Amino acid sequence: MNFQKLIELREDFNLKQKDIAKLLNITQQTYSLWENGSKIIPLKHLNSLCNYYNVSMDYMLGLSNKNSFNNGKYNIDKKIIGRRLKEFRKEKNITQEELASTLNTTHSTISAYESGKTTILTAFAYEICKRYNISMDYL
C-alpha cells in the first residue's frame, strides 16, 4: 500500500506532521509511521484525512489518479460497508471462506465485517479494491 499522497497533500497544504497529528488527536510519531509505510492508517483516520483534504479515498490510496470527490463528506458506517462487501462478494460468486483465504484471515472475520459488527481493516479493504477493481469510496 502506498501512502505517498499523505505526504503530498500535507505538503500541498503547507502542514507539518505535528499539525495533522493534532487534527487527528494522535501522536506525531504515529502519523510519521503512516507516512513512511511502517504502519497502516486506520480507516477512520483515513476517512478524516480525505474529508479534511477534500479528496476521495481512491485518490488518497493511489487506486485512482483522478480526484473525483463530490465535495461531500464521507462517513464510516460499519453496517453499510458490511452490506456492500456482502453484495460485492455475492456478485462475484465468492464465498466468505474464499474471500477470507484471499485476505489471509478467517471466515469469522469476514462474517463480522459483513454483519457490521466490525469495521473492515484498511489493508483488507485496499486489497479487495485492488484485486477486484472496485472503488474504496463505494465500500
Q: Predicted segment positions?
A:
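A short, Lys/Arg-rich alpha-helix, primarily the initiator
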Residues: 1-12, 68-91
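Short alpha-helical DNA-recognition segment
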Residues: 14-32, 36, 93-112
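Short amphipathic recognition helices of helix-turn-helix/homeodomain-type DNA-binding modules
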Residues: 59-69, 138-139
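Residues that mark the N-terminal boundary/hinge immediately upstream of a DNA-recognition element
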Residues: 5, 16, 42-45, 56, ...
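Alpha-helical residues within the helix-turn-helix
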Residues: 11, 22, 51, 90, ...
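DNA major-groove recognition helix of helix-turn-helix/homeodomain DNA-binding modules
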Residues: 25, 44-59, 123-138
